Amino acid sequence: MASKYRGYYHDEASSAAGGGGGGGGGDGYRREKQVRKKRLTAQKRKEIKEAFDLFDTDGSGTIDPKELNVAMRALGFEMTPEQIHQMIAEVDKDGSGTIDFDEFVHMMTDKMGERDAREELNKAFKIIDKDNNGKISDVDIQRLAIETGEPFTLDEVREMIEAADENGDGEVDHEEFLKMMKRIGFGAGFF
């Protein structure tokens, strides 16, 4: 039973938000991320190059942690020093402690994908929360199930709510929704 509604949440929430669905845990998200990397437009690559050159303040051809922090802030990402160092470690293939342009492109493509996944989940939440009260109730899920032709009993719907409802109020708020989606593997990269 649990796998049934996990697939439902993943497939319906992601397709409601324009995602690819997939139902295979995080496989659909990973597949979308790979396609997105391949589709990096020449314009986006040019913008990333301009940002790289702008923030490579010493002209070394690499970005160090201080330069990366400034770059990320300028691109709309507020990050702690620990997050900056972790980002560098994740893409720094040569262990230099700095990021060259190719490493920067890889990192920024991942960050853009994370932002896209969060936007998809936010859209999905709004679609499910039809009455716009900031919470998903059993009524919201039953309505969506009817609209999509998914035959769920009231007990199944309540079980779905209980699985995600951390504060015990009988509804799923936005934060609980994001945590639940992380548990089932959708958009795991941005958490």
Curated annotation (Swiss-Prot):
Keywords: Calcium, Metal-binding, Repeat. Ca(2+) 2 binds at D92, D94, S96, T98, E103. Residues 1-41 are annotated as: Disordered. Ca(2+) 4 binds at D165, N167, D169, E171, E176. One of its GO terms (cellular component) is nucleus. GO terms for molecular function: calcium ion binding. Residues 43-78, 79-114, 116-151, 152-187 form the EF-hand domain. One of its GO terms (biological process) is microtubule cytoskeleton organization. Ca(2+) 1 binds at D56, D58, S60, T62, E67. Residues 17-27 have a biased composition (Gly residues). Ca(2+) 3 binds at D129, D131, N133, K135, D140. The keyword Repeat applies. The keyword Calcium applies. Gene3D superfamilies: EF-hand. Potential calcium sensor. PANTHER family: EF-HAND SUPERFAMILY PROTEIN, MYOSIN LIGHT CHAIN 1, 3. This is Probable calcium-binding protein CML8. The gene is CML8.
